[in-house]
C-alpha cells in the first residue's frame, strides 16, 4: 500500500455506513421540516402521478443512495437561490394548509415567497440534470396550487 493510500477495508466500511445512515438522517430531517408526508396530500403529490402519490402514502418508499444525493442537490440549489434573493422581503419554506372538499388535509411548502405591498411572488426551486426549455406540466400544476393556497391565506 502506498504511503497516502486509504485502506480498501476502510472505504468499504465507510460506504456501508453511508448507505445505512444517510436514509435515516434524511428521513428524520424531512419529518422535522415537512412533517409526516404520509398524513397529508402535498402540492407535488397533486401535480405528479396520482398512483405514485397514493402508493407512497400507503407504503414507505425506499430510495437508492444516488436518488438521495439527487434530492440533496435540490436542497443545495435552494440555498444558492436564497443567497440570490438576500435583501428582498422573502420568507422561506412557507407552509400553507387547506382541506379538500371531502376533508383530506392539503399542505404546500413553498420554497420562497417574496412579498411587497402590491404582490407576492412564489419561487419553487427545481434542479435538473439536463437543461429544460419549458417547465414540466407537473411543475406548473404544483405552483398553481401553491398560488391558490397563498391567495386564500
Where in the sequence are the language-model features?
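Metal-dependent nuclease catalytic cores that hydrolyze phosphodiester bonds in DNA/RNA
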Residues: 1-122, 129-137
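Short, charged, amphipathic alpha-helix that recurs within catalytic cores of restriction-modification
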Residues: 135-150
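Secondary-structure boundary elements
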Residues: 115-119, 148-153
